[in-house]
């Protein structure tokens, strides 16, 4: 079909096509990573994405990480800045990179984590990281 021609290259700050919102494209991404600390990149599940929001009048991005994932939490705890990269199936370059300055971290229950992303497990405890989106 002709669908293949609408491949979107948003990595170079190009705007995604109007038909698909950024949230839809994020949901459609095949994987996501967080780069924190000394450029250490770790793969996190898409369930960690909590979406964009507003806090203190700033645009923020929410991440929820299972407390059992000690590596990811340790890196996030040690970092003031981090970036979240989203990849499409079969692509080694991210189509979207969100640069964040960490504002706060708080513990959330599994139920709260599920509200942010239905893929999370209601029985677990999570850390929620709030990062100001740096343009």
Residues of each region from the PLM?
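Basic, polyanion-binding surface patches
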Residues: 1-135
């Amino acid at each position: 079909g002709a669908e293949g021609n609408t491949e979107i290259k948003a990595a170079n700050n190009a705007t995604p096509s109007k038909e698909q919102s950024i949230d839809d494209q994020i949901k459609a991404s095949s994987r996501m990573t967080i780069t924190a600390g000394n450029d250490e990149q770790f793969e996190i599940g898409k369930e960690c994405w909590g979406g964009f929001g507003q806090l203190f009048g700033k645009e923020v991005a929410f991440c929820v990480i299972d407390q059992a994932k000690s590596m990811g939490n340790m890196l996030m705890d040690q970092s003031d800045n981090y970036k979240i990269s989203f990849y499409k199936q079969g692509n080694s370059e991210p189509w979207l990179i969100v640069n964040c300055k960490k504002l706060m971290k708080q513990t959330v229950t599994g139920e709260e984590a599920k509200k942010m992303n239905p893929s999370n497990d209601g029985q677990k405890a999570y850390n929620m990281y709030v990062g100001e989106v740096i343009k």
